UniProtKB/Swiss-Prot annotation:
Coiled-coil regions, chain positions: none
Superkingdom of source: Bacteria
Annotated protein name in UniProt: UPF0325 protein AHA_1169
Family per record: Belongs to the UPF0325 family.
UniProt xrefs under InterPro entries: UPF0325
Organism: Aeromonas hydrophila subsp. hydrophila (strain ATCC 7966 / DSM 30187 / BCRC 13018 / CCUG 14551 / JCM 1027 / KCTC 2358 / NCIMB 9240 / NCTC 8049)
Cited Pfam families: DUF3461
TM regions (residue ranges): none
């Protein structure tokens, strides 16, 4: 049972508390939160990055116009199904306050960009 989660290295799937799933560029980011253990200030979490699958779809058959679209990775679908099973479909929901969500997304983007800049600078120093 829960073979997909076990293949990710999660030995005790019943310790999963919740999860979040977000899209970042051409990847889906899955973050799994575990139940907090006694004596811990924060619950443990793990993060996984899945590339989105690309498909070319026919938009207009008359003009034979095609459009590239992306969709969730097939393996990730199975993992999310198992997580929904474990959490009874209760995962961290989007905030009703859209302004706060946008601000959080913006702060996260700032961190991602800063980390990428640092990585590029380190690569430049190696040259």
């Amino acid at each position: 049972m829960y073979e997909n989660l076990k293949s990710l290295g999660i030995q005790e799937p019943t310790s999963v508390d919740s999860y979040t799933l977000r899209q970042e560029a051409n990847h889906d980011i899955l973050k799994i939160y575990f139940k907090k253990q006694k004596g811990e200030f924060f619950a443990k979490s793990v993060k996984f990055k899945y590339p989105r699958q690309r498909k070319t779809m026919l938009v207009d058959s008359g003009t034979h116009e095609y459009k590239d679209v992306t969709e969730i990775n097939a393996n990730l679908k199975y993992v999310v199904d198992e997580l929904d099973n474990l959490t009874q479909g209760v995962h961290v929901q989007a905030d009703p306050d859209i302004k706060q969500k946008i601000l959080r997304d913006l702060r996260h983007l700032e961190k991602v960009v800063q980390n990428k800049i640092s990585e590029i600078e380190r690569d430049l120093e190696k040259l």
